[in-house]
């Protein structure tokens, strides 16, 4: 899987990433979207809350149910899709960089084809590049070119906190995808849990890209395998006869990563080069948020 403009354009996928799941509502046809407000397209009904103007009451629904309901609308501009793209050295291992690039281009293509804005932030130990969210084909090509030209950079430790600060500072609201292997300490201080009042303006999803060998080794493996740490520059020997212990440890690492993401209000999915990433991401996005 190559990371060239030609290959990325030929294999870009349209992803169904903009409707998450049905709302538990007494009215048929309601869908849960990332953001709601007083725009122009009718979205859903909800019970009257403190501070809601009486002019927004839907009297037909109120008469039908005996409860006061107000109409909500999709914002005039739906929302921005942001891609936080890890370019730390560990992403250069195996085919991870190419897989991550294909996923990023597909997300950008899907966002812009759906008339949403899309932006891109590269990060490693710090923010390495920023393309503000905009719409249009020329903007998609700008994102594509940036991804093609991006190369893993050496750093002692990947830091995600700085890129999250950049996101929140620069973008008022977004549906954000973090593309990374997450093989580093997750120094989150932000929480993206959706509040009952809908005050959170960023819905964040994590797409963990790993090589198969970072998940498990084949049973009954034998021999010694030199492993090079792309970030520290150190090499260690792995005794393949300890495959069962290795598999157990790697599962513990992934479970810890998922737990920390969950605590920050970020749902996650793991993708390898062997996966159909479009199918897996579409399925992932149709799940109700489990960590909120």
Name every feature range the model reports, one short phrase each:
Residues 1-134, 175-180, 185:
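An amphipathic, basic-hydrophobic helix/alpha-beta surface used to engage anionic
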Residues 1-33, 168-174, 193-292:
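Von Willebrand factor type A / integrin I
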Residues 139-174, 214:
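Von Willebrand factor
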Residues 185-188, 278:
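Short, well-ordered alpha-helical microsegments
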Residues 65, 155-159, 249:
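Short secondary-structure boundary/capping elements
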Residues 131-132, 188-190, 216-219:
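Short, well-ordered secondary-structure micro-motifs
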Residues 182-186, 211-214:
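Short, catalytically relevant binding-site loops at active-site mouths
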């Amino acid at each position: 899987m190559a990371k060239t403009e030609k290959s990325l354009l030929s294999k870009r996928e349209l992803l169904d990433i903009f409707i998450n799941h049905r709302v538990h509502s007494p009215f048929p046809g309601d869908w849960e979207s990332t953001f709601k407000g007083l725009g122009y397209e009718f979205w859903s009904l909800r019970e009257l809350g403190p501070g809601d103007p009486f002019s927004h009451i839907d009297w037909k629904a109120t008469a039908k149910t005996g409860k006061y309901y107000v109409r909500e609308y999709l914002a005039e501009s739906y929302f921005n899709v942001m891609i936080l793209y890890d370019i730390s050295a560990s992403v250069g291992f195996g085919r991870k960089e190419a897989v991550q690039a294909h996923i990023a281009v597909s997300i950008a293509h899907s966002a812009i084809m759906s008339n949403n804005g899309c932006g891109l932030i590269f990060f490693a130990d710090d923010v390495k590049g920023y393309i503000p969210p905009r719409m249009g084909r020329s903007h998609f090509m700008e994102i594509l070119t940036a991804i093609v030209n991006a190369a893993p950079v050496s750093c002692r430790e990947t830091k995600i906190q700085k890129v999250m600060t950049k996101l929140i500072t620069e973008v008022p609201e977004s549906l954000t995808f973090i593309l990374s292997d997450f093989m580093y300490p997750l120094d989150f201080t932000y929480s993206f849990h959706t509040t009952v009042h809908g005050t959170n303006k960023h819905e964040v999803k994590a797409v963990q890209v790993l090589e198969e060998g970072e998940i498990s080794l084949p049973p009954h493996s034998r021999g010694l395998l030199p492993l090079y740490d792309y970030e520290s520059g150190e090499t260690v020997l792995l005794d393949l006869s300890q495959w069962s212990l290795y598999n157990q440890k790697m599962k513990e690492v992934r479970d810890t990563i998922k737990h920390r993401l969950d605590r920050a209000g970020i749902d996650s999915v793991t993708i390898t080069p062997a996966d159909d990433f479009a199918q897996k991401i579409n399925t992932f996005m149709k799940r109700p948020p489990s960590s909120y």
